Structure formats: structure tokens, C-alpha cells
């Protein structure tokens, strides 16, 4: 119990160091509401409680909850040893696609870099965006679709978009893809166990990477999170790892 309390104090001191020292060193302002929010979130994460926090626009809540999550994992590991709890990923659910991308490509890389440089963490923070299979390419169906249009007078931009899926398995990354092509090449609701492409399937590889224990932060929209909850209630296979 003594060590747990000491680790908790140390975790809260690190919050102050991050927001009052490290962030200002990189040109960011000190925001008291942001710091208070991070302390509140960390307390509830470590206490395994539910917290409803009303955070106004512009206080920097994204960094507040990211820092709280990183320190939660670090100090739950130190305080509890190798319990399953600290190995669970954190799920961040947001309705904004732009924010999902920003968390993955801007917030997390910046936070990971400065915390590693400071010695707060020893390894990069790994994250992935999770979404439904209808957003991804089925390699077998893509191959069939490309063969089907070879002799057809297809719109040049749409054809180029379709062919580019050989390089991009996430269809949201490709412009000018027709709705029909998207439906024809997306991962089906049920994948065949004897699919000839299963061993090299990019969608299956994406799922494997997403389930890796080092993939700490799972980013999704609200519908995906609710769908995961529904799967669990119906005793279906969850969409997300236990979090």
C-alpha cells in the first residue's frame, strides 16, 4: 500500500513536469484547466472508476487524456507488477475523423518523442485507428474486380483509384473510388476460412497488428465502440481487445 501511494504521488508530479516544464519548452502554454483535468483523469484511471468530465473547447483535453493514459499504464505496471490490467489497451472514441487522424499522426508522435527524450517513457507510444471491415480492401475481391474491368471502358479516374488499392488497403485513403467499386472490393461480412489470399491478406495483417499487446491506444468512432459493446452482450467475438 505504501508503494502504491508513493507511485501515485510520483505520477501526479510527472503530470506537473510534463505540462509546466516539457510542454512550455516546446512552445506550448501552461493551462491550469488542462492540468486539473489530467490529474482528475489519472486518479480515476488508476482507481478504475468512471469519470464524466465537462471540458470546454480549447483547454487542451486531448493532451490531458493522452498523458493520463500513458502515466496510468506506466504506474499500474510499477505498482502491480505483471497484472493483466496494465497490459490492456486504452480506447479513445471520437466522432471526428479529423481528430482521429490528428491523434494518430500529430498528438501521439509529439507526445511520444518528448516523453522519450525526457526519460518518462522508454518506448514509443503505439496507436492504431480501428474501424469496420467495410472500410478495407479484400485482396481476393480486388483481384477479381480488376480482371472484370480490363476490357471495359471505365472512367479513367475511377479505374486509377481502383488500381491504387493494390498499394492502399484502407479505402478511405483513396480519392475518386466509385461507390460501386468500393462495395465490390470491400472485405465481406464473413471471410472464408479457405480463402487463397488469407496468408497474405492485408486486412488480416492489420487486425494482427491492432491486437498486438504493444498497440496501446486504439482509436475509433462512437459507432465502433458501441458495436463492440453489442458484440460482448451477445457473446460474439469482440471487435476490440479487452480494454
Label each region the model flagged.
Residues 2-20, 29, 76-218, 222-226:
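A substrate-engagement module of RecA-like helicase motors
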Residues 239-243:
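SF2 helicase catalytic motif II
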Residues 47-67:
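Walker A/P-loop
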Residues 229, 234-236:
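DNA-processing P-loop NTPase/helicase core
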Residues 28-45:
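N-terminal pre-P-loop "Q-motif" helix
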Residues 39-40, 63-71:
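Contiguous, well-ordered alpha-helical segments that form the cores/surfaces of helical PPI scaffolds
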Amino acid at each position: 500500500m505504501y508503494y502504491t501511494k508513493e507511485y501515485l504521488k510520483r505520477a501526479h508530479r510527472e503530470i506537473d513536469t510534463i505540462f509546466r516544464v516539457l510542454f512550455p519548452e516546446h512552445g506550448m502554454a501552461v493551462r491550469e484547466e488542462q492540468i486539473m483535468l489530467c490529474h482528475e483523469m489519472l486518479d480515476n484511471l488508476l482507481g478504475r472508476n468512471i469519470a464524466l468530465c465537462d471540458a470546454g473547447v480549447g483547454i487542451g483535453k486531448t493532451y490531458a487524456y493522452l498523458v493520463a493514459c500513458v502515466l496510468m499504464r506506466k504506474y499500474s505496471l510499477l505498482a502491480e507488477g505483471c497484472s493483466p490490467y496494465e497490459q490492456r489497451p486504452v480506447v479513445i472514441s471520437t466522432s471526428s475523423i479529423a481528430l482521429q487522424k490528428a491523434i494518430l499522426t500529430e498528438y501521439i508522435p509529439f507526445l511520444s518523442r518528448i516523453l522519450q527524450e525526457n526519460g518518462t517513457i522508454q518506448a514509443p507510444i503505439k496507436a492504431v485507428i480501428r474501424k469496420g471491415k467495410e472500410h478495407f480492401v479484400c485482396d481476393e475481391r480486388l483481384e477479381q474486380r480488376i480482371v472484370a474491368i480490363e476490357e471495359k471502358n471505365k472512367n479513367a479516374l475511377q479505374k486509377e483509384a481502383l488500381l491504387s488499392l493494390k498499394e492502399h488497403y484502407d479505402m478511405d485513403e483513396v480519392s475518386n473510388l466509385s461507390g460501386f467499386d468500393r462495395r465490390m472490393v470491400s472485405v465481406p461480412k464473413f471471410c472464408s476460412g479457405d480463402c487463397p489470399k488469407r496468408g497474405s491478406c492485408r486486412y488480416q495483417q492489420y487486425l494482427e497488428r491492432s491486437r498486438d499487446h504493444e498497440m496501446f491506444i486504439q482509436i475509433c468512432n462512437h459507432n465502433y465502440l458501441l458495436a463492440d459493446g453489442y458484440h460482448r452482450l451477445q457473446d460474439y467475438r469482440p471487435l476490440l481487445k479487452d480494454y
